[in-house]
Curated annotation (Swiss-Prot):
Disulfide bonds: none annotated. It holds the Pfam family SDH_alpha. It comes from the Bacteria. HAMAP family: UPF0597. One of its GO terms (biological process) is L-cysteine catabolic process to pyruvate. It comes from Clostridium botulinum (strain Hall / ATCC 3502 / NCTC 13319 / Type A). This is UPF0597 protein CBO2008/CLC_1955. One of its GO terms (molecular function) is L-cysteine desulfhydrase activity. Belongs to the UPF0597 family. InterPro entries: Ser_deHydtase-like_asu (IPR005130), UPF0597 (IPR021144). PANTHER family: UPF0597 PROTEIN YHAM (PTHR30501:SF2).
Length: 434
C-alpha cells in the first residue's frame, strides 16, 4: 500500500464501500439464485424445460428459509423458478421486483412438476450458484461466484458466450487492500473524505429508516419489532437509544426476512447488515441531534469497518456476520459520532467482540431479527461504555494486543475453528436438502 497516495487509498475505500452498499429487495441469497437463472434465460432461444441448480452450502443455508418478496413462500427452488418466469437480470439486486401472485402460481407449478432441481456442492466459493437451463435445442450454464450479482461465466451449448474479464475488474485480492489498513487509517479517511462524495450514505439512511417504519406497520416475519414496540408502550422496556435501536433494527429485519417489497440498503452485500450498521448509528444521531454531515461520516465509517471485519471472517461464514461484523461497524460509527477518539472507538469494538463472538449463523430466516436486535442494542451500549472508559483489557480471551489483532483472531476462529461447526450447522439446518 505504500506505493499509493492517501488520496488513492481513500478513493479505493470509497469505491469498495459503494460497491458493497447497494439497494436490494429481499434476502440476497435467493436474489443470487434468481439473478443467475434470469441471466441464463437471456441466452436461451426457446422455452426452458428444466433448471438444475447447484449452490454452495452457505448459499443454501442462508437462502432456504427466508420468504421471497411479495410472497408467503420460502425456497431457493422457488427463487430459481421466479428468476426464469419474471426475473430481469438488468434489475440486479431488484430481480424480484416483478413478482406477483400469477407468477408465483406458475413457479409453484414448476416445482410441482419437478422442473427445478437443487443440490448443494462443496469446495467452492461461499457465494456460488450454477444454473443449468435446458430447452428443446439449447443448454445454457450460468455461473455466479464471489458476489450476489457477479456472473463469472455463461456457456451456451458447450461454448463460452460470456466470461468475466478479471484483468480489468477488481477481484477479491484487489479488494483485500482494506486489510492492510488500520482502524486509525479508516477513521482518518472517514474524517478527511469530501462530504460531497457521501451523498449515497443519506440515501441508505432514508431507505432503511423507511424499511423499519414499514416493518413496524406490517405483520411480517417474526414481528419482533412491533412486539418490542408494544412492550415499550406498556412500559415494560425502556425508551433509551439502545432500546429504540433494538426495536427499529428488528422491524427492518422482520420486513426483509418476511417478504416485504421495501428496498433496503445493504452493507457488505447484505441487507440485514445494512440495517444493523445504519439504524443504530442513526438512532444515536437523532438522540444527540448530530449534524447531517457527522451522521454521514459515522455511517460511512460503520460500512467501512463492517467490510474490514468481513475481509477476515469471509462474506458468508459460520458466525453471524449481521450481528458481529455489522454490529462492530455500528459501534465504531457510534463511538466516533459521540466524539470518541481512537482509544474509545477501538474500545467499543473490543467490548462488542468480547460480548458477541461465538454467535453462530444458523441460516437466514425470520428469527435473524432477534440476533440483529441484540447486536443493535449492544452496539449502542458498547460505545457508551467505551466513552466512559469501560473497555475489556487486552490479551484476555479472544481479545488480542490491538483491535486489529483481535479482528484477526476472530477471522482465525471463524475460518479455522468454526469450519467444522459450520458443516454441523449446515447438516442441522438443511437436513431435508443435504
Amino acid at each position: 500500500m505504500s506505493r499509493l497516495s492517501k488520496e488513492e487509498i481513500s478513493e479505493r475505500l470509497l469505491e469498495l464501500i459503494k460497491d458493497e452498499t447497494k439497494p436490494a429487495i429481499g434476502c440476497t441469497e435467493p436474489v443470487a439464485v434468481a439473478f443467475t437463472v434470469a441471466t441464463g434465460k437471456k441466452y436461451m432461444a426457446g422455452e426452458v424445460l428444466k433448471i438444475d441448480l447447484k449452490v454452495s452450502k452457505n448459499i443454501l443455508k442462508n437462502g432456504k428459509s427466508v420468504t421471497i418478496p411479495n410472497t408467503e413462500v420460502c425456497g431457493l427452488d422457488i427463487a430459481g423458478a421466479l428468476g426464469e418466469i419474471c426475473g430481469d437480470p438488468e434489475e440486479g439486486l431488484f430481480v424480484f421486483r416483478n413478482v406477483n401472485n400469477e407468477y408465483l402460481d406458475k413457479a409453484k407449478e414448476m416445482i410441482k412438476n419437478k422442473v427445478v432441481t437443487l443440490n448443494p456442492i462443496e469446495n467452492t466459493d461461499p457465494v456460488f450458484v450454477e444454473a443449468t437451463l435446458k430447452g428443446e435445442q439449447d443448454e445454457v450454464i450460468a455461473i455466479l461466484k464471489g458476489g450476489h450479482t457477479n456472473i463469472e461465466k455463461v456457456i451456451v451449448n458447450g461454448k463460452i458466450a460470456f466470461e468475466k474479464d478479471n484483468k480489468n475488474k477488481k477481484d477479491n485480492k484487489d479488494c483485500d487492500f482494506i486489510k492492510e489498513l488500520s482502524l486509525k487509517d479508516i477513521r482518518q479517511i472517514t474524517e478527511d473524505i469530501s462530504i460531497e462524495k457521501l451523498d449515497f450514505i443519506m440515501d441508505g439512511i432514508e431507505m432503511n429508516k423507511e424499511a423499519a417504519k414499514e416493518g413496524l406497520k406490517r405483520q411480517k416475519g417474526l414481528t419482533l419489532g412491533s412486539s418490542l414496540l408494544k412492550l415499550q408502550e406498556e412500559g415494560k422496556i425502556g425508551k433509551d437509544s439502545a432500546t429504540i435501536a433494538r426495536i427499529l433494527t428488528a422491524a427492518g429485519s422482520d420486513l426483509r426476512m418476511g417478504g416485504g417489497m421495501c428496498p433496503i440498503m445493504t452493507s457488505g452485500g447484505s441487507g440485514n447488515q445494512g440495517l444493523c450498521v445504519i439504524l443504530p448509528i442513526n438512532v444515536v444521531a437523532e438522540d444527540i441531534k448530530a449534524p447531517k454531515e457527522r451522521l454521514q461520516r459515522a455511517v460511512f465509517f460503520g460500512h467501512a469497518v463492517n467490510n474490514f471485519v468481513k475481509k477476515y471472517t469471509g462474506k458468508l461464514s459460520a458466525i453471524c456476520g449481521c450481528a458481529i461484523a455489522a454490529g462492530i461497524g455500528a459501534t465504531a460509527g457510534i463511538a466516533w459520532l459521540l466524539g470518541g477518539k481512537d482509544k474509545e472507538i477501538e474500545g467499543a469494538i473490543l467490548n462488542m467482540l468480547a460480548n458477541l463472538t461465538g454467535m453462530v449463523c444458523d441460516g437466514a430466516k425470520g428469527s435473524c431479527a432477534i440476533k440483529l436486535s441484540t447486536s443493535a442494542s449492544e452496539a449502542v451500549i458498547s460505545a457508551y461504555l467505551a466513552l466512559n472508559d469501560i473497555i475489556v483489557p487486552n490479551n484476555t480471551g479472544i481479545i488480542g494486543n490491538t483491535v486489529e489483532d483481535t479482528i484477526n483472531n476472530l477471522g482465525m476462529l471463524c475460518k479455522d475453528g468454526f469450519y467444522k461447526a459450520d458443516d454441523v450447522m449446515l447438516s442441522i439446518a438443511c437436513k431435508e436438502v443435504i
